[in-house]
Amino acid sequence: ILASVGEPDLSTTVFGQKIDLPIFLSPTAMQRLYHHDGDKASARAAEKFGTFYSMSTMATSSIEEIANISGGPKLFQLYIHKDQGLTDNLIDRCKSSGFKAMCLTVDTVVAGNRERDHRWGFTTPPKLTLKSLMSFAMHPMWAFNYLTNKKFELANVSHWTKKGSSIAKGVMDYINEQYDPAMSWKDAEYVAVSYTHLRAHETHEN
């Protein structure tokens, strides 16, 4: 009561970084499926409003590309890969590119049965089928932008594995082949030591 709201201040501090809004963008994979500017547009918007941009391992722009276009605070969503070298590569690149924090994702050690994806034959990048051709025809501007911009790829991992390149691959197949189902607290400890700011997932048991 009678707390002055003449000049409200929504700013807060997250991971030691002051941000202008008490919210930030969650990591979203494969944003170029929705718009040809994808991750870059999201990073610019987050910087404009003074909050964190969160990048998915499965982004369609690279860590370095985002670092070059955005001076705002950035967080990286990390998956533990079966290939430790790839996990280390992602951590090192984030540190070199000035990402302020890292979020270790632990809910994808086994891919879910996404029946809609199976039904529609969803792959990344999209492959040509009768259904997809009909969808492209109904969205001509999306199809034009997709065809006239750089090739679709999982830009953070395509240099390391062909399964992140322009070869059409089911997302669940990629997860099952690349992510480590044996991930444990030892992996979380390893990432925490490797990267100072690791966002923790807390439960009563943990």
For each predicted feature, which ranges?
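Conserved small/polar residues in nucleotide/adenosyl-binding loops
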Residues: 196-203
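Alpha-helix-loop-beta-strand connector modules within alpha/beta enzyme cores
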Residues: 68-73, 186-188, 193-195
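N-terminal capping/small domains of soluble enzymes
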Residues: 1-109
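Glycine-rich, aromatic-flanked loop segments that form ligand/cofactor-binding clefts
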Residues: 107-111, 149-152
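Glycine/aspartate-rich loop-and-adjacent alpha/beta segment that forms the canonical ThDP
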Residues: 110-128
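An N-cap/entry alpha-helix motif that binds or orients negatively charged groups
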Residues: 1-17, 125-183
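Conserved phosphate-coordination/catalytic loops
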Residues: 57, 81, 178-185
